[in-house]
Amino acid sequence: MADSNASTEETPCGSIVVIENVFHYKQIIPLQMGDNVIGRHQKGNPINTAFETVDPSVDLNHCTINVSRDKQGRLKYILRDNNSNTGTFVENVEIPPRERRVIESGTLFTIGGTSIILKGPDEED
């Protein structure tokens, strides 16, 4: 039997895993469909994918992962830098300004001194 609330429930879209370092503890942050703005958590900062860190090289609004579905219904992840001060790197290659990079589950990307791994919805940490 179909649940009338099914359309309002969130579909798992994967997560980002912030790897522990001297600036912060390990954090797992769920992603949602659409733009997921990633950056340093600060009270009053309205971004939707913030993590707690004291890393000064992570901007408050550092980068964005857009989650959508392709024509086959598979999740698609597109990463872009938000004109950050230190850049966004995918496997040690900087994403140039105004460019986007398609990434997939297991991709390692770096913002400031912080390494992050994209995980698909069916993967465990």
Can you annotate each of these PLM segments?
Residues 1-56, 66-76, 120-125:
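Intrinsically disordered, low-complexity acidic Ser/Thr-rich regulatory segments
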Residues 62-108:
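Forkhead-associated
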